[in-house]
UniProtKB/Swiss-Prot annotation:
Propeptide, chain numbering: 206-228
Tissue specificity annotation: Pharynx muscle cells from its early formation, in the two-fold embryo, until the adult stage.
Superkingdom of origin: Eukaryota
Name by which UniProt lists this protein: Growth arrest-specific protein 1 homolog
Source organism per UniProt: Caenorhabditis elegans
Keywords: Cell membrane, Developmental protein, Glycoprotein, GPI-anchor, Lipoprotein, Membrane, Signal
Glycan-linked positions: N143, N156
CC annotations in GO: plasma membrane; side of membrane
UniProt keyword annotation of Iron present: no
Lipid moiety-binding region (GPI-anchor amidated aspartate): D205
């Protein structure tokens, strides 16, 4: 049995390794060689493997992003990160076109230009937006935030079905009120969990396809062992 299992593990590992880009592999190695980044990365590896966009995965991603080497890894193409399909589907990757609102806020707070614009918007407009009101001044302030390179994620950021109120409050009560009826802005749905995704979700399909490729490799190997 051991003679069968060892090559099987090597086959699966090879299938995964062949898809990893050099940039992602370097970023992952750098993170694993740094104790702080490694300690932040371990919970992500464990939590982001259920394909259900759990809060534990979100918290782990936000924790990794607060580390410099972790940010570099998450900003890569993520081809070397286990659970990458879940990270994409849950919008937990900062380089994607649609980003989780809490991750977008964290990225904005780390950028001087975005943070200064967003800080003014929050101080001037948070109270009114919480009541469902948004003045023209507040719309202008939010647009100024969105016009920054990092703040652009606020125009279509999203939450998952299992999110806490911090994300939904930011998306629906603060951003949503002022983005409503804004030309060129399309609000993303809050629910983007894998388990509840519609059948036409390309990201969910890619996740299934990736798993199918691995299972195919395993099936071919086992068939070879049984025949020969």
């Amino acid at each position: 049995m051991r003679r069968v299992i060892l090559p099987l593990v090597m086959t699966v590992t090879l299938c995964l390794a062949q898809e990893a880009s050099e940039a992602c592999t370097k970023a992952l190695t750098d993170c694993e060689n740094d104790l702080e980044c490694q300690n932040r990365l371990a919970p992500l590896m464990a939590a982001c493997s259920t394909n259900t966009c759990q809060p534990q995965c979100r918290s782990a991603v936000l924790n990794v992003y607060q580390n410099k080497l972790g940010r570099i890894l998450l900003r890569s193409d993520a081809t070397c990160i286990p659970g990458r399909d879940e990270l994409r589907t849950c919008n937990f990757l900062p380089a994607e076109s649609t980003v989780h609102c809490s991750l977008g806020k964290l990225a904005c707070e780390g950028d001087l230009q975005c943070n200064s614009k967003f800080g003014v918007f929050m101080s001037e407009c948070e109270a009114d937006a919480a009541r469902g009101a948004c003045t023209d001044k507040c719309k202008t302030l939010l647009n100024q935030t969105i016009e920054t390179s990092v703040g652009s994620v606020f125009s279509n950021c999203t939450c998952t079905a299992r999110d806490d109120q911090l994300c939904t409050n930011l998306k629906d009560n603060l951003l949503g009120v002022c983005l409503k009826n804004t030309p060129g802005v399309t609000l993303s749905p809050s629910d983007n969990s894998i388990t509840d995704a519609p059948g036409g979700n390309d990201l969910a399909d890619s996740s299934v396809g990736h798993g199918f490729n691995i299972l195919s490799a395993i099936s071919v190997y086992l068939l070879t062992v049984l025949v020969f």
